[in-house]
Amino acid sequence: MVELKHVCAAFSEREVLHDLSLTFQRGEVTVLLGPNGCGKSTLLRTVLGFVDRTGGEILLDGCPIEDFSPRKMARQIAYLPQSRPVPNITARRMVLHGRFPYLGYPRRYRKEDHAAVTGAMEKADAADLANCALPQLSGGERQRVYLAMALAQSTEVILMDEPTTYLDVRHQLEVMDLARRLAGEGKAVVLVLHDLCLALRCADKVAVLHNGRLQAFGTPEAVYDSGVLQRVFDITVHRTRTEKGWRYYYD
């Protein structure tokens, strides 16, 4: 579990997150929503210590986040950023990087490392890309490889910043299904998404940010009922009940 208590953060002395308090629970998918530049990605990077925190505290399973070394942190939290470099290596070699927190130096991969990589690539629908060079892959294929690398870290918390970027509709839905399955395994899954309807459909909890401030945090139904989505996005959001639950759309 990751708990943020009255967290503030700043870039170059300019405060960008203001008094945020929310919790990412194990066994749940939490989606961060908000307009561009509202602080969603910054929130994830603040949890990881990449952005200076100027106030408040962040707890990982009840312990201050600053008590964790980078190596120990990488065994607890996996992070899929918006973009990554594209080295000239195979997809499987890239996914093996997810095992670095468990290796000494020089790095010698064990059977369990190779097994974790194989399982992660299968989960991310990237197994058929194993021997392909990353520069030769499409953006969507590379995204699946990067997702597999995050899964290969075998962490209990997974932070993903726009994981559906570059993916076609089928693979977007597969990523959301994977997020649900990971939560079902007891992991805390946190996603930054721009697809409002997909987020409301798949999330257990939704956090809405605007100008670095938390506007709402709760179930999709509670957030919808609050009217905050209309105010923040300046749209009209509708919902209809189907056999599979609520479906949302907007105009």
Explain the meaning of each model-derived region.
Residues 2, 17-19:
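Conserved structural motif at the start of ABC-family nucleotide-binding domains
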Residues 48:
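Helix-to-loop junction immediately C-terminal to a conserved catalytic motif
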Residues 56-64, 73:
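Conserved ABC transporter NBD signature motif
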Residues 96, 111-129:
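Conserved ABC ATPase "signature" region
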Residues 108, 133-137, 141:
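Conserved ABC ATPase signature
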Residues 158-162:
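Catalytic Walker B motif of ABC-type/P-loop ATPase nucleotide-binding domains
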Residues 230-251:
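ABC ATPase nucleotide-binding domains
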